[in-house]
């Protein structure tokens, strides 16, 4: 496996079946054990590396199922807002829900072509999950 495919597949995680996107999300869950700023930094790194890798793949017009660095970026962003184990579980569940159902802006981004669309729908899904978690924290759910 070349370096670009290794990055895009998150070290081969994207080739796990079934549900490679879920495996990509699960792969970054250990970030929940670290301070939130680490997950936020990871989200930025995954986003940048993912965009870079996607511009170098021949399949840049599509969103191949084995490309899961986008899930890593979005899930990391959601985890940055998680507090406690309930928050971590909600971060995972909300991110996967928004990534799969593609509501509103997630669906808009998903319809964009190329590396931007591949990365943006997951980053937006992660931001939406983080926003829900922050709102829940404001009302005392942690």
State where each predicted segment sits.
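Interhelical loop and helix-boundary elements at the membrane-water interface
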Residues: 1-26, 52-79, 96-128
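Short, conserved beta-strand edge motifs with alternating hydrophobic and charged residues
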Residues: 28, 42-46, 68-69
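Interfacial segments of multi-pass membrane proteins
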Residues: 26-38, 76-82, 133
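Short, aromatic-rich membrane-interface segments at the entry and exit
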Residues: 20, 36-43, 85-89
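Hydrophobic, membrane-facing alpha-helical anchors
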Residues: 1-4, 39-49
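Alpha-helical transmembrane segments of multi-pass membrane proteins
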Residues: 32, 43-52, 79-80, 91-100, ...
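Juxtamembrane boundary at the C-terminal end of a transmembrane helix
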Residues: 133-142
